[in-house]
Amino acid sequence: MEEPTVQFSDEDLVDNFPPMDDERVQLEDLEFEVERPSEGLEDEGSHSSAKKESKGAEKMRKSTTKDQVQAFHLRKSLNLLDKMHEEKDVFIQKTKGELHICRQRMDLLNKQQESLAAEIATEKEANNMAAIGRLQAASRRLQTELENEKDLQSKITAMLKDSENAMWHIEIQKGQFEDVRKHHEAEAEARQRGLEVHSARQLQREREAMEKSEKNRLLRARKSLHTQKELGLRHQKLVEDAQRNHRIAVKFLKASLGRVREREQKEEMESRTHMQRRMDAVLSLKNNITASRETLKKFQAWGQTRADLAKQKALTEKEVILSQGGDAFKYLFHQRRHQELEAQKRAFEEEQKLRKQEIVNRILKEEAEEEQRKRRQHPLSKPINRRTLRDKTWQYISDFCEGKSVLTSQQERERELLLYPKTVCVIKAISSESVQVDLGSISTEDEVLAEPDISGLWNKESYQVPKEDMERKPVGGSKMEKDILARTMEQLRSGVVQKQVVSGREFKGRPFNSKPEVIHFKDFDIGKVYKKKITLINATYTINYCKLVGVEENLKDFIHIDFEPPGPMSAGMSCEVLVTFKPMINKDLEGNVSFLAQTGSFSVPLKCSTKKCSLSLDKELIDFGTYVVGETTSRIITLTNVGGLGTKFKFLPDSEFYEMDESQPAMKISSLFTCEEKIIYEKIMTSLSEQQLEVNDSSLVDLQSLKESEKQLDDPEVTTAAVSAMTMIPSEEQAEITLGEVTEGEIGPFSSVKVPITFTPVIPGEVQTKFKVMFKNPQSPPLYFRATGTAIDVPVWVPKATVDLKICMYDRLYQDSITVHTRSKAALRLKFEVCKELRGHIELLPETGYIQAQSTYSVQLKFLPRQSLPEDARKYFDPASRVLEAPMTIRVADQIKPVRFTVQAIVTTSDLEINPSEINFGYCTIYEAIRTEICLSNLSLLPQEFGFVGLPKYVDIQPNDGFGTILPLETLHLDVIFQPIKAKEYKFELVCKSEINRCFKVSCQAVGVHPPLELSHYQIKFSATSLYDTSVSTLYVINSHLSMNKMIHSLPRIGSEEAAPVGPTSFEFLLPPNSPITISPSVGTVLPGKRCLIQVAFQPVLPKEIIYKEASQILNKEIETKPVSQKEIVQRKELWKQSFSVVRVHNRDRPTRVSTPQATELQRPVINSSSTEFQIAQATLSKAFQGKFNRFVIPCVVASGDIKDRKTAEPLSFSPHNTLYLELWCPAVAPFIVVTSHKGKTDFNFGDIAVGHRSVKKITLQNICNEDLTLEYSVLNPNGPFVRLNPFNKLRSGETQTLVLSFSPHENILAQETLDIITKRGTLSLTLFGMGVASMITCSIDGNILNMGYVLARESVSTNFKLQNESSLPIKFWVRLESLSRKKAEAHQQLPKFITSHEQRAEIVGTQNYNGQSVFSIVPVEGLMFPGKAQEFTVTFSPDHESLFFSDLLKVVLFEKKVSHQILLKGAAREHMMFVEGGDPLDVPVESLAVVTAFDTEHKEEAEELKPILVTLNYVQLDTDTTTSPATRELQVGCIRTTQPSPRRPDHPLMVSTLLQLRGDVKETYKVTFVAHVVTGL
């Protein structure tokens, strides 16, 4: 806040002021002022001599310079004073503000002190000592703050006073320099006026120079124009010659091309026909293959489904049986056995069928051979009792099925030759297909052949009783034996109730004792026969009898008793009974063998038990005792099987679950199919194979593979596993008591297996583990045992069993400390060992040491991984994961188990890889930058910081200027941007340093190019442009190369090559094909020091391919939805008839497939850019357009020279290195306003409209953007034919409005205009065009007057004329007569014409008929004239009385408004055929309204009066000396052609007589005869 006050003197202000920045400007002004007196001396021109003038000027220049220097220093002093005055003023204002704030704070503190004093008084009254202390402390703090504020106020006040004093001193000094200031201001104004005068003179000189240059330019332009005209004439001549030669060449070329096209079309048609046939064949083959594969897939899926269903059914049955408590394994075994037997039976039947077919085929073949052989022999007599082929076949089949010997074909032929010599059998040939079909339908069981009435009549051999039947006894014995048995049984029955009393004692109990007491067949096998003898001992007191009763019902199928009754048996005597057991099922059987004795019945128990497992362990507890941690011991446990059935076993811990695999017997997959299904399947497969053989050999592979799969499925060795073994769940912790190597296997009957149990203590303490033995046999329950042991700990241990060094880099040292503990009460010697492979990388220090009792010992671990670590420690190092696990050993004296720990580390490299290692930027201009991408890869597992250092100023690396952190195994993509500053060759290196100061280099090279031309802009960003709208931007191509002096500016060159010459330089922009960019001009020449304006236009459009695709879809929909017209149906019928007739002609010889695509599909119209579908598709796609952004880089090649100087075919030598690039950003968006009417078209054709008429079109516009738009319209030509009828200025979002436009041509012209609808989001251009057609009609009447001539009254005459339509529009016309117009009624209101008639007629409509009808009529009165056609009109003249003044006006009106032609119709009527005209008129030219009465035809000539003709001849002779011409008048005598019959003969001329009365001096009467011949009708 302190501002020191400094006093300045005048000398200090003048001398010690630092120099200002405007010294240069002041010196320039000084030079101007020095030159000004010399100019004034020149203007005065009144000096005596040049010497005096120069001396005075030199003296004045010296004095002026001194004054200017002094004034300059004074000006600097004044500026310094002004600056100091401003600073002091600001500082004073700031100090005053701080003083005001300080006073406000003091007032606030005073108020707070007063409030605190009041609160202290209040608390004192309340005797609140705590509050009083707190308030007093606050009061003291406020007092301190108030004192500080007072000190601050005094300081600020002193500072303010000093500042004001300094301010006053500065103002006093400024007052002293006030006169100097005013003087300098006056000088500045004078200097400014001088500058303005100088500027005006300079401007005048520049204008004169400009006018002179403009004249020179006009002169050069005239000369250039003259030269261009000469060149144009010469060029036109050359073009005409070239065109003439071209026409001659084209004539011959067309002829040659025509022949070539005909030949190519012929070849193309042949190739198309051939290709069509091949395509049809391929499609047919493909369809057949697809159908076959689908069928095979269905059958495979069918078989798989049935197999799954069968498996599911088996599992369900197993669960049901288990839930019911039954034996599921036995049930499934029997079921599978049954299925196996059924499958074998079906397989045997199928084999029999195949054998039958094979035999039949063989017999047929032999018969065919025999028939051929016998045909070559002479015919023999009729065979006697010859067996047919059918008999022999079935005889052979029956013999084969019964197992008899079958004769071979050769033996059969020999036998036939012996039995039937010289016999021939004519056998009808049977195809193999019919034989197969018959055999497929024959069943050996269902076929019933014809049999004779007497059995054995047809048999050739007598029946022989088989040996088995002879040896077989009848069931139940012979008749005699049955009688004996009946008597014996009767005796036995009668003696059952007999009591045996001997010596007074009655026998009670079992009469016979059996040895053994129980008949037990153990461990039997199905199919084998077991026999046992039992001895029956008479246990009664006297003689007894024994008779076999039998066995129980459930044992009769398996037990056979051989017992011959011994007769009476004394007491103690015995007899033997042979019991035979033949098991058929694997099932336990129990029952009794019953006997009958004289004293009663008794029985011997019978048991049949299957093979079973009887398993046991020799011990249930294994006690290992006490062992030290690390030692290993083992015990043996024995598993014994005393049963007759072996099984598989597995020892496992009690905590684990394991289910033994149950092997299922072989089951054929084919058993899943029934016989009927298999027959159907075989038939389908046979048909498929036949089709495939006809189509292609490739399908044989599929069928072969299918058959192989069937064989594999039918193979009995293929079995399905019922239950898969579950995997054992490993224990998370390592078990101390484990099983040995033998944990599972198979134990046979009556054998034993020994299994070792191992105890390896790891943790001190008591260990107990339970085990169980699982068996595959479900009837054998698991066995359990347990093992116990006690472990004691070692005295030395390491707390950290694993030393984790984390991630380490090669060639860097890492250290850690390892602590060893002991619980021993004595000192122990320790030795630290590192494995041999890692001794060059890991070191433990010290290697040997002593650890004291119950203490710790530290060892230092040093790890320095070398690059050879992966090769040295292959056993401990994983190259894939880069993990090192090195075991370390601590050997302790008197301790068996060494202490081990592991050193674990992830070893990684510190390399950074840069790809590519060499960069060649190529040629690069100084106006552009080349960007290339490099990949920086971190091969380490640790993140590393990197940075590119020491970069040249023309190289940049992005992002982040080439600095950053790269993550482990990450690859960063960096952009190296090279922009040369001048043209030369560049070679440099990019250095990348890591955080550990490792350097990685990339070598770079490039060539800098300075092009002769440059662009004003190298990048253009267009605004968002709607589809079919245009955005335009401008730039300049500048030629700044003016001199070859390299000291002035850098010369354009390529690298170190020679500089480009000074002169006109040409350029050309190379646009990519099909781009929406237009550059105008794209080619040009720029003179040195000049620039050329370039316009770049961007007009986004939709690709035509997409539009054509959308248009074709629209056309297809229209064709599908369009109903078929009757014409198309008739056309299709005709085409079908034609194609059918062609097929019928070809089918006379063989069937031929004829393709007639015209009959099935009509030819579709061709879509072009002017079609309706194309425009609809374009509008639809424009609405759905989502926007697109394109970036174009347009190259601009540069060449030295002028384009005009080059020859016609010689291109300029453009260098590829002197290429400029223009970057364009082109965003395209959907249009914001679209046309919804006229199918979205923006081109509106009003068509051909007649001149003077108007056509109106309504255009519907819709705003499809999300905001309201204000519309502006471009100005249409005010004198043009197009007019906007209802312009609207606003279109809301989604709103639709209608714009009405009209087209009214004023002349015959093709009109086209563009109406731009302008919004802030874009412009919609509507193209309007129409043709104004003038109604050009020509009339065949010359002069527009049609004179009908003379007609006899009450007759009519007609004549024709034509109107020709010369325009391109059909014209509607109306023909109107003036006498029939509406204006006639107005004419009736006026005075009659004969009253106001003049000497000459002035009316168009003359005399009319008396009967009210028009005297003139015309046909037709209206119609339509087509373009180029003529319309013929017939005009009829029908007068009803005599008059010479018939007239009317005929008007041809076009389009009800325009009068095209006016034809005056005239005619005259006479009562007689002959008439005379001429002379002076004797009546008025208009007839009276009175009607002259008509006379009869007979008396007409008598009643008529002769009408005189007044001919006045005026002869005036003014001078008698001269002869004058006589007075003449002309009279016309006419004859009218009539259709009335004439009474005179035609060979006599018609005589006309008249009387001439001459009035004057001579009165004579002459008779004059006029002869008139009718030459033409008038």
From Swiss-Prot:
Residues 33-65 have a biased composition (Basic and acidic residues). It is found in: Cytoplasm, Cytoskeleton, Cilium axoneme; Cytoplasm, Cytoskeleton, Flagellum axoneme. Its main location: cytoplasm. Residues 1-21, 33-67 are annotated as: Disordered. Residues 103-156, 330-378 form a coiled coil. One of its GO terms (cellular component) is axoneme. Residues 1-14 have a biased composition (Acidic residues). Gene3D superfamilies: Immunoglobulins (2.60.40.10). InterPro entries: Ig-CFAP74_2nd, Ig-CFAP74_3rd, Ig-CFAP74_4th, Ig-like_fold. GO terms for biological process: axoneme assembly. As part of the central apparatus of the cilium axoneme may play a role in cilium movement. May play an important role in sperm architecture and function. Belongs to the CFAP74 family. This is Cilia- and flagella-associated protein 74. It comes from Mus musculus (Mouse).
